[in-house]
């Protein structure tokens, strides 16, 4: 019998809690990640008030320097710790795959200076369309169409760009490059990025519509991902008949592997929380696992090095936690964590190699305190033990500590 009938895992994308022990091996603009501290530096420079997460025990997590504006709780409502990454990477897919029990020893490739000419030329030859070279770099998806959409409407050139993650994205105006044509180009791009030196996690078709100054991305986005190299705990749950619900980009990250119910992409964090709440309310969801990613922290504020915006985004999530609590059952477990860091005060614009926080809450708890410090995969090991399935490659369960 499961200790918790439902477990809900929410990933606050990039909300790290201090440099990892191996941060000296990871860099931003030539600066090692050793002084990175996403939550700490936001708290220090922008001020941070997250009373609902603080009540669970966020301020009680062991740190060299306490979070400046988040106090410790003498009697928290939950259990907390911080977790270290084992895998050799600090991207979204690596973080999520490890959370679900895998150890990634060969990270995906990222292209901070844009894709090499060899890849661009192959795409041009296949598609019969030129590529706008100025867009070939890490770019905000909305900014890149604002900057190059007018040119694409005139010339029919492709907008090919990347991000901090191992992805190749192609944006195309639906009136200029039909969606089906864009899909075929992306399928080809997927076929040439399956091994080093260009092993990419995802190829993303990014259709949009509108006029210059008023472009809008459409719902015709399509991801061409790779599945995890072996079964994760998601697969083990699904194989055992335990329903799994994906909210946000979780389905894309795992290429649908082990997902029994995809609840769709998020338009924003707020929309993602709405979808999570709707998922919690589903009458058929009496037992199982929900997995939510909220990406605005990372995409809108971490990469853009905007600590005030990041702070406000954290405030927004914290303000909505009571709604999530209100839609949980007494025997539900909520786990709040992250997948990597992205310190908005740090050098460069890339992710940062950090510990991630873990907050555990259930209305059924009679105790509280600290969970032993462990690793990302401990989350999936805990989920696995709760539902009586095998773990994946790595991870130690902390289920017995939740009382």
From Swiss-Prot:
<feature type="binding site">
    <location>
        <position position="303"/>
    </location>
    <ligand>
        <name>Mn(2+) 2</name>
    </ligand>
</feature>
<keyword id="KW-0963">Cytoplasm</keyword>
<dbReference type="GO" id="GO:0006018">
    <property type="term" value="P:2-deoxyribose 1-phosphate catabolic process"/>
</dbReference>
<dbReference type="GO" id="GO:0000287">
    <property type="term" value="F:magnesium ion binding"/>
</dbReference>
<comment type="function">
    <text>Isomerase that catalyzes the conversion of deoxy-ribose 1-phosphate (dRib-1-P) and ribose 1-phosphate (Rib-1-P) to deoxy-ribose 5-phosphate (dRib-5-P) and ribose 5-phosphate (Rib-5-P), respectively.</text>
</comment>
<dbReference type="GO" id="GO:0009117">
    <property type="term" value="P:nucleotide metabolic process"/>
</dbReference>
<feature type="binding site">
    <location>
        <position position="298"/>
    </location>
    <ligand>
        <name>Mn(2+) 2</name>
    </ligand>
</feature>
<dbReference type="InterPro" id="IPR017850">
    <property type="entry name" value="Alkaline_phosphatase_core_sf"/>
</dbReference>
<keyword id="KW-0413">Isomerase</keyword>
<dbReference type="InterPro" id="IPR010045">
    <property type="entry name" value="DeoB"/>
</dbReference>
<feature type="binding site">
    <location>
        <position position="339"/>
    </location>
    <ligand>
        <name>Mn(2+) 1</name>
    </ligand>
</feature>
<dbReference type="GO" id="GO:0006015">
    <property type="term" value="P:5-phosphoribose 1-diphosphate biosynthetic process"/>
</dbReference>
<dbReference type="InterPro" id="IPR024052">
    <property type="entry name" value="Phosphopentomutase_DeoB_cap_sf"/>
</dbReference>
<feature type="binding site">
    <location>
        <position position="351"/>
    </location>
    <ligand>
        <name>Mn(2+) 2</name>
    </ligand>
</feature>
<feature type="binding site">
    <location>
        <position position="340"/>
    </location>
    <ligand>
        <name>Mn(2+) 1</name>
    </ligand>
</feature>
<dbReference type="InterPro" id="IPR006124">
    <property type="entry name" value="Metalloenzyme"/>
</dbReference>
<comment type="pathway">
    <text>Carbohydrate degradation; 2-deoxy-D-ribose 1-phosphate degradation; D-glyceraldehyde 3-phosphate and acetaldehyde from 2-deoxy-alpha-D-ribose 1-phosphate: step 1/2.</text>
</comment>
<dbReference type="GO" id="GO:0008973">
    <property type="term" value="F:phosphopentomutase activity"/>
</dbReference>
<feature type="binding site">
    <location>
        <position position="13"/>
    </location>
    <ligand>
        <name>Mn(2+) 1</name>
    </ligand>
</feature>
<dbReference type="GO" id="GO:0030145">
    <property type="term" value="F:manganese ion binding"/>
</dbReference>
<dbReference type="GO" id="GO:0005829">
    <property type="term" value="C:cytosol"/>
</dbReference>
<comment type="similarity">
    <text>Belongs to the phosphopentomutase family.</text>
</comment>
<dbReference type="Pfam" id="PF01676">
    <property type="entry name" value="Metalloenzyme"/>
</dbReference>
<keyword id="KW-0479">Metal-binding</keyword>
<dbReference type="GO" id="GO:0043094">
    <property type="term" value="P:metabolic compound salvage"/>
</dbReference>
<protein>
    <recommendedName>
        <fullName>Phosphopentomutase</fullName>
        <ecNumber>5.4.2.7</ecNumber>
    </recommendedName>
</protein>
<keyword id="KW-0464">Manganese</keyword>
């Amino acid at each position: 019998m499961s200790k918790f009938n439902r477990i809900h895992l929410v990933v606050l994308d990039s909300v790290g809690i201090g440099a990892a022990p191996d941060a000296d091996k990871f860099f931003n603009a030539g600066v090692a990640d050793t002084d990175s501290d996403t939550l700490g530096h936001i708290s220090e420079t922008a001020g941070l008030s997250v009373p609902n997460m603080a009540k669970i025990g966020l301020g009680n997590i062991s740190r060299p320097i306490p979070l400046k504006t988040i106090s410790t709780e003498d009697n928290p409502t939950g259990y907390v710790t911080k977790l270290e990454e084992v895998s050799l990477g600090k991207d979204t897919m690596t973080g999520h795959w490890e959370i679900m029990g895998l150890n990634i020893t060969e990270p995906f490739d990222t292209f901070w200076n844009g894709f090499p000419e060899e890849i661009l030329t192959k795409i041009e030859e296949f598609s019969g369309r030129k590529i706008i070279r100025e867009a070939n770099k890490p770019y905000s998806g909305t900014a890149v169409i604002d900057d190059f959409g007018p040119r694409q409407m005139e010339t029919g050139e492709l907008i090919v760009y990347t991000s901090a993650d191992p992805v190749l994205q192609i944006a195309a105006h639906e009136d200029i490059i039909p969606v089906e044509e864009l899909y075929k180009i992306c399928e080809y791009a997927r076929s040439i990025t399956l091994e080093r030196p260009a092993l990419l996690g995802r190829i993303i078709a990014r259709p949009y519509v509108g006029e210059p100054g008023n472009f809008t991305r459409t719902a015709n986005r399509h991801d061409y991902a790779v599945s995890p190299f072996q079964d994760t705990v998601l697969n083990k749950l699904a194989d055992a008949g335990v329903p799994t619900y994906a909210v946000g980009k979780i389905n894309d990250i795992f290429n649908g592997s082990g997902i029994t119910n995809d609840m769709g992409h998020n338009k924003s964090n707020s929309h993602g929380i709405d979808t999570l709440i709707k998922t919690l309310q589903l009458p058929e969801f009496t037992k199982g696992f929900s997995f939510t990613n909220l990406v605005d922290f990372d995409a809108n504020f971490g990469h853009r090095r905007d600590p005030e915006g990041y702070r406000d985004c954290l405030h927004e999530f914290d303000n909505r936690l009571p709604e999530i609590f209100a839609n949980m059952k007494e025997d539900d477990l909520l786990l709040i964590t992250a997948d990597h860091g992205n310190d908005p005060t740090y050098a460069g614009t890339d992710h940062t190699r950090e510990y991630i926080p873990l907050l555990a809450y259930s209305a059924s708890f009679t105790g509280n305190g600290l969970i032993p410090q462990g690793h990302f995969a401990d989350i999936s090991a805990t989920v696995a033990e709760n539902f009586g399935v095998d773990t994946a490659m790595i991870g130690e369960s902390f289920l017995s500590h939740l009382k």
